[in-house]
UniProtKB/Swiss-Prot annotation:
Residues 1-24 are annotated as: Disordered. The lineage of its organism: Bacteria, Bacillati, Cyanobacteriota, Cyanophyceae, Synechococcales. A motif (Gates the pore) lies at residues 120-121. It comes from Prochlorococcus marinus subsp. pastoris (strain CCMP1986 / NIES-2087 / MED4). It holds the Pfam family BMC. This is Carboxysome shell protein CsoS1D. The keyword Hydrolase does not apply.
Length: 256
């Protein structure tokens, strides 16, 4: 069995790199196999290096999506829709286009469903859903291992703004409702809690914990962009309780 060159020097285009692989043909049955070329090996090595350069900005695991948050995420989802009680993993990475590689790794690791994948100018985000927590966490672990990161290496959240405003006026309520088309409407006289975080994805954890803690209405949840923004409304006492739960959730991540 003798190796025969798969590409002669004279056949190569000007300026193209030399391919050093060879095709080995068997004289007995005519079968052949292709030996990996040096150029292919360098490509594989370069791809592995690129994956390891991906920066983990946000890693948010929600054990059980609350009804309002699940419904809200469904209104903005372009993929599979979540249902209340599903587990959810939200990840944000940098650079933005790296989210395609992260998504590919996560989906091939388990039976999770892809709800959202957003490519921004600087960052990329994705949302994974499944009814079993272990399935979602497994995909997350595989991604972390692939990019050489850990949960503790994610960017710590910081709170840019937090406030409770009591007894919203009619004019204010109308403008809020016209700006936010995906969530519920706020009514005049309600109290409102607003929260702004960086990175953006952490507002999902705040929203989920706030809904668990009190009888409030989710008005708006923006988990993409430079900052995450959460708006809740309800009775003053309920809003204050939900606000405390939301801030506590952010602080727990910061102190992890």
């Amino acid at each position: 069995m003798e190796p025969t060159s798969s590409l002669n020097r004279g056949d190569r285009k000007k300026g193209s790199s030399l391919v050093t692989g060879s095709e080995v043909q068997s004289q007995s049955n005519g079968a052949s196999c292709f030996i990996t070329t040096d150029s292919e090996k360098s490509l594989v090595s370069r791809q592995a290096s690129q994956v390891e350069q991906i920066e983990l900005r946000t890693y948010v695991f929600l054990d059980s999506l609350q009804p309002q948050l699940a419904a809200y995420m469904g209104t903005v989802s372009r993929g599979f829709l979540p249902i209340p009680g599903d587990s959810c993993l939200w990840m944000e990475v940098s650079p933005g286009m790296a989210v395609h590689r992260v998504t590919d790794i996560a989906l091939k690791a388990s039976n999770v469903r892809l709800g959202q994948m957003i490519v921004e100018r600087a960052f990329g985000s994705l949302a994974l859903y499944h009814k079993d927590q272990s399935t979602v966490l497994h995909s997350g672990d595989v991604v972390l291992d692939a990019i050489g990161s850990e949960v503790r290496k994610r960017t710590k959240p910081s709170t840019s703004w937090t406030e409770v405003i009591c007894a919203i006026t009619p004019d204010h309520a109308v403008l809020i409702n016209r700006q936010n088309r995906s969530g519920s409407m706020i009514q005049s006289g309600m109290s409102m809690f607003i929260l702004e975080t960086e990175p953006a994805g952490y507002v999902l954890k705040a929203a989920n914990e706030a809904e668990k803690s009190a009888n409030i209405t989710i008005i708006d949840v923006k988990a993409v962009g430079a900052f995450g923004r959460l708006t809740l409304a309800g009775k003053e006492g309920d809003v204050e309780e939900a606000a405390a739960a939301a801030i506590r959730a952010i602080d727990q991540i910061s102190n992890y």
